[in-house]
């Protein structure tokens, strides 16, 4: 009896999984996610310093986040930049310090560059979801401005929460050795998972089911953690970039990591979109059709 249930379950699920991965592979080829990731990586490096400067400027306007900056820098560079984090951190700090001395026109131009990154991410993800209608310009600008202003506040709040969890983990370590450290190690992955899910639900200009967004976010988070470990292992054991570029090795390493990160983001987006196309369309096909009354 149990064997019959397993066979029935397999016969029902296997075709859907086959359709899902078929749609996923087809979409990845059609959308050329590696090319889109390269474009986003270039725009990210161009917009990184302006975006960080705007983030820290907005956070400094709130006294509650005055002490968060150093914690935020440590959290980001230690968990999301697998190698050469100290060198990248130093360069970013110097760049942001130089940018903060610019005139009002210069700061405004940096703000435009930061908005350019958000705009490119928005357009790329909506192209993946095959969005037909564009948002009104006023509505689009309002969304971008909300990301610029509210984003730093949310980031600061998340860092405060992670600091609280660090203290809580240290407290639980006294009573349950190993448990606090294990739970604390899940914080970066949890932050990445939440960021992916929000990105896949909010950015597309169409409805995305939360369950699909979270499944896609789980896939992207697993891929991100595996890639981060593999990238760190490669750069540590095969330092060919340092032999070729010397002191400038951090530049291609950072670009390569940003490029791989965007591939993972688009990879998760394609998987999320494929879930909706495979399962929701299948439900629509099997839904009973209404017969018009005569």
UniProtKB/Swiss-Prot annotation:
It is found in: Cell inner membrane. It comes from the Bacteria. The chain crosses the membrane at residues 45-65, 99-119, 141-161, 182-202, 213-233, 247-267. The keyword Cell inner membrane applies. One of its GO terms (cellular component) is plasma membrane. Keywords: Cell inner membrane, Cell membrane, Membrane, Transmembrane, Transmembrane helix. It is a multi-pass membrane protein. PANTHER family: INNER MEMBRANE PROTEIN YHJD, UPF0761 MEMBRANE PROTEIN YIHY. Belongs to the UPF0761 family. This is UPF0761 membrane protein MADE_1017605/MADE_1018330. It comes from Alteromonas mediterranea (strain DSM 17117 / CIP 110805 / LMG 28347 / Deep ecotype).
């Amino acid at each position: 009896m149990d064997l019959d249930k397993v066979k029935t379950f397999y016969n029902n699920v296997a075709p859907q999984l086959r359709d899902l991965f078929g749609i996923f592979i087809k979409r990845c080829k059609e959308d050329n996610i590696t090319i889109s990731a390269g474009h986003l990586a270039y725009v990210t490096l161009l917009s990184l310093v302006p975006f960080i400067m705007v983030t820290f400027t907005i956070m400094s306007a709130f006294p509650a986040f005055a002490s968060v900056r150093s914690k935020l820098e440590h959290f980001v560079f230690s968990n999301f930049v697998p190698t050469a984090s100290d060198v990248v951190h130093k360069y970013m700090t110097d760049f942001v310090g130089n940018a903060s001395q610019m005139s009002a026109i210069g700061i405004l131009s940096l703000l435009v560059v930061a908005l350019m990154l958000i705009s490119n991410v928005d357009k790329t993800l909506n192209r993946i979801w095959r969005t037909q209608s564009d948002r009104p310009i006023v509505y689009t600008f309002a969304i971008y401005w909300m990301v610029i202003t509210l984003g730093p506040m949310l980031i600061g709040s998340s860092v405060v929460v992670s600091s609280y969890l660090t203290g809580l983990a240290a407290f639980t370590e006294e009573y349950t050795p190993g448990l606090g450290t294990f739970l604390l190690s899940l914080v970066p992955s949890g932050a990445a998972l939440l960021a992916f899910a929000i990105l896949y639900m909010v950015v597309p200009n169409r409805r995305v089911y939360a369950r699909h967004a979270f499944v896609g976010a789980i896939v992207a988070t697993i891929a991100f953690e595996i890639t981060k470990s593999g990238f760190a292992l490669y750069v540590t054991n095969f330092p060919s970039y340092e032999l070729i570029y010397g002191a400038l090795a951090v530049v291609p390493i950072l670009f390569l990591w940003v490029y791989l990160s965007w591939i993972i983001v688009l990879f998760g987006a394609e998987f999320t979109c494929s879930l909706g196309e495979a399962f929701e369309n299948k439900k629509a096909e099997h839904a009973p059709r209404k017969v018009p009354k005569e």
